[in-house]
Amino acid sequence: MTTGALPCCFGGQTMKLEGFGIFVKDMATMVRFYRDVLGFEIKEDENTSNVFLEKDGTLFLLYRRSDFENMTNTKFHYAEKINGHYEIALSVENYSAVDKTYSEVLEKGAKSVMSPTTEPWGQRTCYISDPEGNLIEIGSFVK
């Protein structure tokens, strides 16, 4: 039996996760939210069709929907309101930091989806959404 992760290779090349992105309708609003509310660092000009942000070494791309559709010559359908297709998971130091961070991001304009609660598996967690309804979890396993 093998333990640990096996490297994934394609044509002799290793593939690794560098970051992730979401397609956005209102670039300015979304840049402000991730920068000012959640503390992401902007890595390039924020007035382009895609904006790279970074949080703790992970790249996070905001890509303007209309520009992507023009590039691919395809019309896509997007979720409205709260989007339950995925979450962006952020961790904080401990249980009390979950509560404090939740209060702070609500004061800065995040929308509450679920207030802090301690789950049976030992995680204290809460959910907020960004201005376009993407779910964001803030949690910790440290009491």
What are the residue ranges of the model-derived segments?
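Conserved catalytic core of two-component sensor histidine kinases
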Residues: 21, 28, 99
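Conserved active-site tyrosine of GNAT-family acetyltransferases
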Residues: 30-35, 105, 130-133
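Residue-level signal for the nucleotide or nucleotide-sugar donor/cofactor binding architecture
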Residues: 22-25, 93
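Vicinal oxygen chelate
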Residues: 8-18, 41-129, 140-143
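Conserved beta-strand-loop-alpha-helix junction that forms the acyl-donor binding cleft
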Residues: 24-27, 120-121
